[in-house]
């Protein structure tokens, strides 16, 4: 059933932005199906955005996105989180404002006068989230995929958190756990990562994170596994800069990846074999046929496009042979000329064969017609000669009879 998301802005309280930058967040919860798109200030904030993978729990997805901005610009300047869920035709805009006090006993003074707000009263206790491995790590044998368990809103008074990991209900002890202090609300965040085997994830094994803390009435368990379903390989198309762009200082290449399922995919760019960093991907979008598509745009200076031999769009997806497909576009004049000539020759040959076929057909028809006419004339002349000869030839038999 299609379910629109609920959107919650996550912002520090007044007085907690003491550093040079501040991180703002947007929690998108309770939607189905995938996917959603999160933009900040209509896309003008993009360089410091981090989007976390979606988590499926109880048939609904939850994901989050964060952006880091200079503390000198917020909250004096507006920051807005925009969430679009195409499947439900839902668009939600949330303005990020300093969070007000949770406790009414010791309220926070206005931000202009505030130096340090009291720590929030975390009556609800810690929250636990589990995240799947990066798809590139899963599909590349040289990398190590990891499942991540994140515990947030841990009180500084009871910071001890016990995290246990299970694979198909068998406990494992290879996880690495780190603790971080969240300055914006004076809480503890605990991150535990479990290295896993590639085949364990691909085969659908279940990974469980079990968390316990004094502020929890009972342990919290979160499970995750690879979503089962039809696997469809993507089709990849790489598009050169439009002709109108070539007169400008900057140009862009586009990689269109369509028709794939599931939605987990990795797209990267290289030029002459070297990794490119200046590109942006859309989130996978659910198409009308149930498959997904994605756009990736590589930006560069026009001079680089003119000087570089080739650019490649590298796609990794479980539906591909060896999980990998590379599409390359070349700026080499020789190669470009060959491609153009090849296409022109194909067109010329098609036209030439058509002309030759028509000519041969007409020639054979003409020969047949001429032969038929000639044969008819010869037959007519021969018949006339025979008839004439019969008329003028003397009747020697009668002549002999008369002589006798």
Swiss-Prot record:
Residues 5-97, 126-225, 234-330 form the Ig-like domain. O-linked glycan consists of Gal-GalNAc disaccharide which is modified with 2 sialic acid residues. GO terms for cellular component: extracellular region; extracellular space; immunoglobulin complex, circulating; plasma membrane. Pfam families: C1-set. Keywords: Cell membrane, Disulfide bond, Glycoprotein, Immunoglobulin domain, Membrane, Repeat, Secreted, Transmembrane, Transmembrane helix. InterPro entries: Ig-like_dom (IPR007110), Ig-like_dom_sf (IPR036179), Ig-like_fold (IPR013783), Ig/MHC_CS (IPR003006), Ig_C1-set (IPR003597), Immune_Resp_Modulators (IPR050380). Residues 369-404 are cytoplasmic. Glycans are attached at residues 104, 185. This is Immunoglobulin heavy constant gamma 2B. PANTHER family: TAPASIN (PTHR23411). Disulfide bonds join 26-81, 149-209, 255-313. The keyword Cytoplasm does not apply. The chain crosses the membrane at residues 351-368. PROSITE patterns: IG_LIKE, IG_MHC. GO terms for molecular function: antigen binding. GO terms for biological process: complement activation, classical pathway; humoral immune response mediated by circulating immunoglobulin; immunoglobulin mediated immune response; phagocytosis, engulfment; phagocytosis, recognition; positive regulation of immune response; positive regulation of phagocytosis; positive regulation of type I hypersensitivity.
């Amino acid at each position: 059933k299609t379910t629109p998301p609920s959107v919650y802005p996550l912002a520090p309280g007044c007085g907690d932005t003491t550093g040079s930058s501040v991180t703002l967040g947007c929690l998108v919860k309770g939607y189905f199906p995938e996917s959603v798109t999160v933009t900040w200030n209509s896309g003008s904030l993009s360089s410091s955005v981090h989007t976390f993978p979606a988590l499926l729990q109880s048939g609904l997805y939850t994901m989050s996105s964060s952006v880091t901005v200079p503390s000198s610009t917020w909250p004096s300047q507006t920051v807005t989180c925009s969430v679009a869920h195409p499947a439900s035709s839902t668009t939600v805009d949330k303005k990020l404002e300093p969070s007000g006090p949770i406790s009414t006993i010791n309220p926070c003074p206005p931000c202009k006068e505030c130096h340090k707000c009291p720590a929030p009263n975390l009556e609800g206790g810690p929250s636990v989230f589990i995240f799947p491995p990066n798809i590139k790590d899963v599909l590349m044998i040289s990398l190590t995929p990891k499942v991540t368990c994140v515990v947030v809103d841990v009180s500084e008074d009871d910071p001890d958190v016990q995290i246990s990991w299970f694979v198909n209900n068998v406990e494992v002890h290879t996880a690495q756990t780190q603790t971080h202090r969240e300055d914006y609300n004076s809480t503890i965040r605990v991150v535990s990562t479990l290295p896993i085997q590639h085949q364990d994830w691909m085969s659908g094994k279940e990974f469980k994170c079990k968390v316990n803390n004094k502020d929890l009435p009972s342990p919290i368990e979160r499970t995750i596994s690879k979503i089962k379903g039809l696997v469809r390989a993507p089709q990849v198309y790489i598009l050169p800069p439009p002709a109108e762009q070539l007169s400008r200082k900057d140009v862009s290449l586009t990689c269109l990846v369509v028709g794939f399922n599931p939605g987990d995919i990795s797209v990267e760019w290289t030029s002459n074999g070297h990794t490119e960093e200046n590109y942006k991907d859309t989130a996978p979008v659910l198409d009308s046929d149930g498959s997904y598509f994605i756009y990736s745009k590589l930006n560069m200076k026009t001079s680089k496009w003119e000087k570089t031999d080739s650019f490649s769009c590298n796609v990794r997806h479980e539906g591909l042979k060896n999980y990998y497909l590379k599409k390359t576009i070349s700026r080499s004049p020789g190669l470009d000329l060959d491609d153009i000539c090849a296409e022109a020759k194909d067109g010329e040959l098609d036209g030439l064969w058509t002309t030759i076929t028509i000519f041969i057909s007409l020639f054979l028809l003409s020969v047949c017609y001429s032969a038929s006419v000639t044969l008819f004339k010869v037959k007519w002349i021969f018949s006339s000669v025979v008839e004439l000869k019969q008329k003028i030839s003397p009747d020697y038999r009668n002549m002999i009879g008369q002589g006798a």
